[in-house]
Amino acid sequence: MTTTMEYHNPVLLHPTVDGLDIKPDGIYVDVTFGGGGHSKEILRRLGPNGKLFAFDQDEDALANALPDERFTLINENFRFIKRFLRFHGIKAVDGILADLGVSSHQFDVPERGFSTRFDAELDMRMSQKNDLNAYRVVNEYEEQDLRRVFFDYGELKNAPVLARTIVEARHHRPIKTTDELKEVLKKYLPEKVRNKILAQIYQAIRIEVNQEMDVLKEFIEQSLEILKPGGRFSVISYHSLEDRLVKRFIKNGMFEGEPERDFYGNFSVPFKTIGKLIVPDDEEIKINNRARSAKLRIAEKI
């Protein structure tokens, strides 16, 4: 049986949970349950009357459900956090934790198609219930849409040529696997930067398949609605696109533009930042390579 640590090494475990400033009788939400590492630590700090709700859209995570009467696991995308908490009678919470991106488990299961290390069918769905997968993005998207995906989500300067090359190749036969995709794009993968560019290409397709940026925006906006005044928001991001959204919303209460002003002309913002940006130390990165790009931001609702 797969253990929690094999499934997912919790990144920045103690700083992330410390950031929630756990109240023993509080109500908390872990929106990225995975192997349950962060949830276990939250439960350890909760008293007998505290509650923890966890979300994970990946069906594989259900095997890690914790046998604790204070704990409820919801097999849904966290973009629906408000809806499903209300279903359970919860309208306001004391803290929300999010460990964004792909779990170690998802990267390590070849058939999921997330990792550049394995050949697999083009899938990349975080939930097998979703209709859109990587095969459809690669084989059905118009050239201009592929260009947008690679430019916006992979931050690839050669997005136009990558999109054109894929469209020309699939005209002859469908691109069905990750190795076939690598073969199609091999002349744009020089050895020195091959892994970096591949990671950017995979990231771009994965974000599109799972609508990650739209999901993140919806989640952050709903989190503001359901957090109590003084409630904590503790978020780990792994790439600049995620971190930029989190940082802007914490700072301004919006993703673009200037924050609103109050009657006296002062900026009206919903959060105050708690502490500085936290990143893993060398020791954690040595133990858990996934932590190398992690950035933790903590905020408190005003």
Curated annotation (Swiss-Prot):
Reactions that this protein is recorded to catalyse: cytidine(1402) in 16S rRNA + S-adenosyl-L-methionine = N(4)-methylcytidine(1402) in 16S rRNA + S-adenosyl-L-homocysteine + H(+)
Record Gene3D superfamilies: Putative methyltransferase TM0872, insert domain (1.10.150.170), Vaccinia Virus protein VP39 (3.40.50.150)
Subcellular location field: Cytoplasm
Family recorded in the similarity comment: Belongs to the methyltransferase superfamily. RsmH family.
Keyword Cell division in annotation: no
GO BP terms: rRNA base methylation
Protein name per the record: Ribosomal RNA small subunit methyltransferase H
A single Gene Ontology CC term: cytoplasm
Superkingdom as given in the UniProt entry: Bacteria
Documented EC number(s): 2.1.1.199
EC category: transferase
NCBIfam families xrefs: 16S rRNA (cytosine(1402)-N(4))-methyltransferase RsmH
Upper classification of the organism: Bacteria, Pseudomonadati, Bacteroidota, Flavobacteriia, Flavobacteriales
Keyword Cytoplasm: yes
Binding residues annotated for S-adenosyl-L-methionine, in chain numbering: 36-38, 56, 84, 99, 106
